[in-house]
Amino acid sequence: DLYIEKIDPSNNKKYLSNLNNQVQSKEIKTRQVIIEIKDLPGKTITVQETDNGPILPDTFPGLKDIVPPGHMAAISWPGFDPNDRSLGALINLMYSSNVKNAKDKLIDFHSPIQNFLLVDKENIAIQVAGKIPLRSKSHATKGLYPSLGYIPDNAWTGYINYQNNPFILNPPSGIVANTNNKIIDREFPNHISYEWGDSQRILRLTNLLEKREFHTAQSFIDIQTDTISITA
């Protein structure tokens, strides 16, 4: 989510934040970060943050078009969580012995949110893994476009419990596949996304998978490199 933060008119080192349901002035957090560069000296940059996340530099392309004077933009992303253990989750995933074990390992995966296709000798499954933000029903923009950072209802309220993320095990079709399409047709209690991939690609993929009773490495290569568009 992109947040528009209002700079304190009386002190440009502070911004307006909601504290205990009251708009109050708060210090902008500042820290030095060293970017390591192979075979070259590291580069030190200054990172500024609000409660909603890092502040984007005003030189960012197009930012001045949406940020009014006296304001700045901060970005919230699950990947900024200092407790992010996504890399460890992926390493542990490679040591999984079955679908259930793999599903359990992905609880530590934070970002980016992904669909994982899991297969063992007896089961096939799709597991949505990653930290999916929870937003208030009163959130002004639902994360679709920038919102004011000092409005309480616009703040994230946490993340969807991993155990409630969509999980499909052994579907009747006998196929698990995904092309960024919506993976469940039924009503889902938690919001995940407003935008999904088109239906043409998943239809084409499903058709190719259903054409053969048995697949080989080459048949999967052919599917991966397929360029036919149903729409065209």
Predicted feature locations:
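Mature extracytoplasmic enzyme cores
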Residues: 1-232
